[in-house]
């Protein structure tokens, strides 16, 4: 082989190697920036503690998120300087996410967060039922009675009703229902501590817990923002005048599971600790989980003279100063016997 032929052969080989390298780099670049094979929106990958990089890549391939060579994943991790720095946890793989974005999330520990919303007006039993259905949440309250649950969240001896602030709480896989309950309990206690000192003067409420009880009644009586303070005002004036509160939601709560969607006359006369038709003052505990607006209404009731109200049937209420006026309103809006 002549020297010229040798040089030509070397040149061809170098060109071939350059072509291979360029092709490989282009293919690698395409891999790092191309979306993963996500089959459904909301899919996720759960990386266990102590997983090696090789195991992570194998898991991605096993879930059909990637068919790329493990070498490409290794090169990308080295290029991003995240090799050996990937955190365990559940990571979202939404449509359009790229390998580069996924590794960046894993390196930063940006695990998938879910939200759980406690709805204003839920009872504690309804809250527990909703938690039981929450996905990716450890259910540690199973088999525990209410007293045991309160003890587990550091509130031993407290009645649970009303003690949890309706709000949206973020959680990640591995969190438990007890974690959410504890956060909601702390949030409610903090809210009462913040709002109680600024309450209106001379309210017939001795403690923040009294305010919580009244707020829970307001919460169950109306969902309208423009009526909360009005209804709170009615109840405050009735308390000041030593009148029975006579509010149906407390009766319903006291009936427990025997309530089947309708109150009968006998229910109003059957005494329970929560029957405000037979017992004076506030019931012994809240009857639901009041939201912050209802608590504000209880602490800042609207001034006025109304002592009664009745539902119109459209979500609003009509208010009355006297029993005679209330009787006419009941006949009109409840019995549909409006006088002309």
Predicted features and spans:
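N-terminal type II signal-anchor transmembrane helix
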Residues: 2-40
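Short alpha-helical segments used as structural interaction elements across diverse proteins
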Residues: 4-5, 71, 323
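Bacterial extracytoplasmic/cell-wall-associated proteins, especially those involved in peptidoglycan
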Residues: 52, 129, 133-141, 151-340
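Short low-complexity stretches enriched in small and charged residues
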Residues: 11-14, 42, 83-85, 122-125, ...
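Signal peptide-directed extracytoplasmic domains
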Residues: 25-193
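N-terminal start-of-chain detector that recognizes signal peptides
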Residues: 16-19, 64-65, 88-90, 140-143, ...
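A broad, low-specificity signal for short, low-complexity segments enriched in glycine/proline
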Residues: 4-8, 50-55, 75-79, 88, ...
């Amino acid at each position: 082989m002549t020297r010229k032929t040798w040089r030509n052969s070397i040149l061809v080989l170098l060109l071939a190697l350059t072509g291979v390298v360029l092709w490989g780099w282009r293919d690698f670049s395409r891999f790092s920036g191309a979306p993963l094979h996500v089959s459904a929106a909301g899919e996720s990958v759960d990386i266990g503690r102590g997983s090696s990089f090789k195991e992570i890549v194998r898991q991605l391939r096993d879930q059909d998120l990637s068919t790329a060579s493990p070498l490409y994943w290794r090169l990308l991790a080295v290029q991003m300087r995240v090799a050996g720095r990937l955190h365990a946890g559940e990571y979202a793989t939404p449509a359009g996410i790229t390998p580069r974005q996924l590794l960046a999330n894993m390196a930063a520990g940006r695990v998938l967060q879910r939200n759980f919303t406690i709805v204003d007006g839920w009872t504690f039993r309804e809250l527990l039922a909703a938690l039981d259905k929450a996905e990716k949440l450890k259910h540690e309250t199973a088999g525990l009675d209410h007293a045991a649950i309160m003890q587990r969240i550091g509130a031993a001896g407290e009645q649970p009703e009303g003690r949890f602030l309706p709000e949206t709480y973020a959680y990640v896989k591995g969190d438990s229902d007890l974690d959410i309950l504890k956060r909601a309990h702390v949030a409610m206690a903090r809210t009462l501590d913040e709002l109680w000192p600024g309450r209106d003067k001379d309210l017939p409420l001795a403690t923040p817990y009294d305010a919580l009880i009244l707020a829970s009644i307001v919460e169950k009586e109306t969902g309208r923002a423009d009526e909360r303070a009005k209804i709170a005002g009615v109840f405050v004036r009735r308390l000041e005048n030593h009148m029975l509160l006579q509010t149906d939601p407390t009766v319903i709560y006291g009936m427990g599971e025997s309530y089947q969607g309708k109150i009968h006359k006998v229910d109003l006369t059957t005494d329970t600790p929560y029957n405000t038709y037979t017992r004076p003052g506030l019931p012994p505990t809240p009857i639901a989980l009041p939201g912050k607006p209802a608590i504000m209404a209880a602490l800042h009731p609207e001034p006025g003279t109304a002592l009664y109200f009745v539902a119109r049937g459209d979500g609003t209420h009509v208010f009355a100063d006297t029993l005679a006026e209330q009787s006419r309103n009941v006949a009109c809006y409840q019995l549909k016997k409006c006088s002309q």
